[in-house]
Amino acid sequence: MALRTLDSLGSLAGKRVVVRCDLNVPLKDGKITDDGRVRASIPTLHALIAQGAKVAIVSHLGRPEGAPDAQYSLAPVAQRLSELLGKPVTFASDTVGAGAAEAVSGLEDGDVALLENLRFNPGETSKDEGEREAFAAELAAFGDAFVSDGFGVVHRKQASVYELAKALPSAAGALIATELDVLDRLTENPERPYTVLLGGSKVSDKLGVIGHLLPRVDSLLIGGGMLFTFLAALGHRVGSSLLEADQIGTVKGYLEQAKQLGVEIVLPRDVVVASRFGVDAEHLVRPVDRIEDTGWGTSGLGLDIGPETAEVFSERIRAARTVFWNGPMGVFELAPFAAGTKAVAQALTEVDGLGVVGGGDSAAAVHALGFSDDQFGHISTGGGASLEFLEGKRLPGLEVLGW
């Protein structure tokens, strides 16, 4: 079956439509610091408003413990949605209680309401199917149809993603359709050379995608904290850098597999080593075989790829026709260790082909470092969902929509 899209729902004029968006944005002092996910939800919302639907948006934010927690309120998001849509957005003080019921019942054709954080309710993320179904039924009472547009959560079997889609006539929104189109281009006959750049802190988070991609790519570039496990697998000493010793054997297996497949795994030549973790820490650039040659010995820790590596990676990225990047090259939140991430991001903007930022921390990094969405071929809104798709996994939030 093909993914059901908005057209499959017929006319939605005057209909109540519950829309699952992913509005899980970072907040600081009650202010949104990166509104990328809010902006990504706008095309679907505009389409529903134009049809004259009565739109009730649901989303999570953060990881509250199944109960109301003011620091995770969606109230700031309602304000930003209103600004982007150019119309008032009613904010409900709860998700399925009297506040939500009043907000939805008061909607006129083309109006929009945002209900409070889904995860203030234990049924949203419950491991018990019956509890999820009961919560989904409460949400379904607010709609005549359901539109799933939160790509960042389609790999989760949660009430508003899976059970709600079964409880109402349902379809995917424009964002999910766009995300899948891009991911299909990465998996179905990608233009070559095809280069994948992986970073982030842990090898263990990327094992599945490394194993699945090795037979499919031309080269794999490794940065971020995970690089030190690769270096250790080659016999290098890495000081106090992040190291998953229990994954060294697995990494050795991947290095051997890549050799047999003729796929090049490109590892850093140099790294930025710091005396400690901190923005004002002393730091030096060292070749990967001299990480402990700093005066700090085994207490030094690598926090970014070095300038030579950044140039090598950038050249590889610019030479490719298809590039997928997931995971920062270093601790980009600290200015002395952001150069590697900034360099590869810049190179990705210069790709003559498809350059994809794979969501999560990578998307946060490009925004924090001053890049705009339109500089890249695509910035995914789902880090975990993108990786699981590229691992070849079936995603419950998509299967329930006919995918």
Swiss-Prot record:
EC primary class: transferase
Main subcellular localisation: cytoplasm
The keyword Ribosomal protein is annotated on this UniProt entry: no
Coiled coil ranges: none
Protein localization: Cytoplasm
Residues bound to substrate: D22, L23, N24, R37, H60, L61, G62, R63, R119, R156
EC number(s) given by UniProt: 2.7.2.3
Residues binding ATP, per UniProt: K206, G302, E333, G359, G360, D361, S362
One Pfam family it belongs to: PGK
Alphabetical UniProt keywords: ATP-binding, Cytoplasm, Glycolysis, Kinase, Nucleotide-binding, Transferase
Stated name of the protein: Phosphoglycerate kinase
Gene: pgk
